[in-house]
A protein has these predicted regions:
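Membrane-spanning alpha-helical segments of multipass transporters and channels
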Residues: 1-279
Length: 280
């Protein structure tokens, strides 16, 4: 919570009161992408750290029959949900201090988009933590997010992505979040921006901004649904990987041979007892 408030105040100090000129367009885009990037790292990496530390302990306890894999995994998912409250605080502070679209519906869409991104980032972290050793997961996590950042929509135009790498955008939760946030912010027909008049590039309205980044066909609802579908698929994959990790350990099955004491005593006659005592 503390770090989220610090980041929110930092963004507020840098982007506070963005204008409706061309610099304001650039600042809005930069702030939106930084929000996506911050939420990606702050959601995925803690998920990797926490689960990787518990992984071996959980697998051993499951092998001993302490609890089922599904019970642990569901409890882990539920335990991660309260952490979203700090993201609500972060996004609310940034949204109103920076001065994004004041429409309440746009604000609610903004919250929905960032929550879906956080869930997808947590799912990415769970996949890495369950499918890789601890050291590899901690190293591969930031590298994976960096690749997703390149295809997020601001550093590389979606229309210029090579054909062989276009599939990355379909599994890139940062792209889904950033494109949806841009559509939410600049998709308003009343969004207009002033031009400097110095002969440079001018983006007079939100439609021109979306077209520049190849987001003109992007809508919020489909992007949110894609994020939810991606999250569900990644969580299922993480669960399968956890089950496979658990199967490497032989379940502990202690078979105790405990015949009834009364039957043993009844099977021993008094004569047998006396005979054993005479032999002694």
């Amino acid at each position: 919570m503390f770090l989220d408030v610090v980041y929110a105040l930092l963004l507020a100090a840098l982007y506070r009161g963005v204008g409706d000129d061309q610099e304001g367009v650039q600042n809005r885009l930069g702030c939106l992408f930084f929000i996506c990037l911050n939420l990606a790292y702050s959601s995925a990496l803690p998920s990797i750290n926490l689960f990787a530390a518990e992984k071996n302990i959980v697998i051993r306890e499951q092998a001993s029959g302490a609890y089922a894999t599904s019970a642990y995994y569901l409890s882990k998912l539920v335990a991660e949900l309260p952490k979203l409250s700090s993201k609500f605080v972060f996004c609310t502070l940034v949204y109103w201090i920076v001065g994004f679209n004041p429409d309440p519906t746009r604000y609610l869409n903004f919250l929905l988009i960032v929550v879906c991104e956080c869930l997808a980032a947590q799912a990415i972290g769970m996949v890495m933590a369950t499918g890789l050793p601890i050291g590899a997961a901690l190293a591969f996590g930031p590298a994976c997010i960096t690749v997703f950042t390149l295809f997020g929509g601001i550093y590389l135009n979606m229309d210029s992505i090579p054909l062989g790498a276009g599939w990355i955008a379909y599994v890139d939760f940062i792209y889904y979040a950033f494109s949806a946030l841009c559509a939410n912010e600049f998709g308003d027909a009343d969004a207009t921006f002033t031009c400097d008049g110095d002969g440079g590039r001018c983006l007079p309205d939100g439609a021109a901004v979306l077209e520049l980044y190849s987001f003109e066909d992007i809508r919020v609802a489909p992007q949110v649904l894609c994020q939810l579908a991606l999250t569900f698929g990644l969580q299922c994959l993480a669960f399968v990987l956890l089950v496979r990790s658990s199967s490497r350990y032989m379940p502990l099955r202690i078979e105790r041979e405990a015949p009834d004491l009364n039957k043993r005593l009844s099977a021993t006659s008094p004569e047998d007892v006396e005979l054993k005592e005479e032999k002694k």
